[in-house]
Amino acid sequence: MRRFYTVMTAVALTVATVFSGVSTVQAGGYHEYDVEKYVMNQLSAASVPGVSVSIVSDQKEIYSATFGVDGKTQADYVLGNLTQSMTALGVLSLAEDGEIKLEDDITTYLPKYSALKGVTIEKLLHQTTGIKKETMLDQVKAEGKEGIYQNAYVNYSILGELIESVSGETYEEYLTENILDACGMTSTYSLRQNPEMQEEMSPAYKNYFGYPVAAKYQYNASDQWATVSSGYMISDVKDMGKYLQMYLKEGGDVVNPEDIAGVLQNTVPVINKSKEDSLYGTEEAYGMGW
């Protein structure tokens, strides 16, 4: 979630903004010095408090390091929008098992959202429901133009409820059993599920007039704007390296290759984008959680 962190994932490089001091493991064949020099220069230029870096192949972790204030590669941080990619995989897992169809109307499973009659699960995945960004869960309605991408956390909050309703489990339980365990991810959780982990988390940083200011993350169960499934899963950089490996393996033991291709390549254009939706002036498109 951009109000806490920015998490960016590339094909062979995972960079997650957790704010911690240099700790390096398994450099493999990479030139550590060159990697670290580049990262430190970028941190300084961008006035970023810290960053964690993971470089992986589809078979192993090649390099993992944390730069900044904390000094732990195991530092926990809020995944923000990257949580949505996990939620998308959870929904696709249900579809693979024949529990749902992506073209199904969401009200078939969650009739309480009667204002979304005609909105399909696939539209929620693509965020083309017409729900506006500032919409709260208790006031859900499709006010915008359906079929046009608009980033609204409520879309993925509703998908989290779908997973719970269909599976009969909590979102975290289903994700752990069907996604995280298969990826070997043992340090990914939510504070709703594990409130005792509050003190283990690295602080979030917000930018005030060019200066990073630490802010302790607090899970708010009554938050109607964003929920666990739309932005509040927590992880560390080593687990995120494992998550990236699953994509490099085209789904591995988690979902089939066609679904991974669909998540990444079945996209809708991002138009009328804000600065936070823009990446280096490129043309953006949105898949399912990506």
Question: Locations of the language-model features?
Answer:
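Sec-dependent signal peptide cleavage junction
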Residues: 18-30
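Short, surface-exposed loop or secondary-structure junction motifs
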Residues: 114-290
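Short, conserved catalytic-motif segment at the N-terminal edge
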Residues: 29-79, 99-101, 133-142
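Bacterial N-terminal signal peptides that target proteins for export
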Residues: 1-9
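Acidic helix-start/capping segments at beta-turn-to-alpha-helix junctions
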Residues: 56-58, 105-113
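Short, solvent-exposed alpha-helical surface patches in non-cytosolic proteins
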Residues: 80, 85-89, 109, 119-128
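Bacterial N-terminal signal peptides
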Residues: 10-20
